[in-house]
């Protein structure tokens, strides 16, 4: 189905660990079909959880192993400051703003450390209300042009969408 018109990415949920060697097959498919990989990520403290959960370090390792694959580390409010720092040196690794409840200053921190082109809106629907997920960006202390990039420009660029 990846060859179908309009197919833009691969979403990997909580059932896998991004550091697992089998992820090379996902990277190969993403490369072959020019797809973005969105990896569910969450900071974990219990090592047993990491079998089926990707900690920010796991997602960063996946990005480091496959520098030619565009990867989104999902759930900024689940990966927190540590996730941003894990992504900082990896230009192919982006973060989305979905996840838990808004945390004051976190979006600004991500933009400061990753730049305005590597942070993008994430809704995590139906778990979060759109008013909350959009509001965390609209309420951030950022210039309007940066907010536009976060809300749609960066995603459009990553997914090769044409904006009219």
Where are these regions (language model features)?
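Active-site gating/metal-coordination segments in enzymes
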Residues: 1-45
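Mid-to-C-terminal alpha-helical segments outside catalytic/metal-binding sites
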Residues: 116-118, 131-164
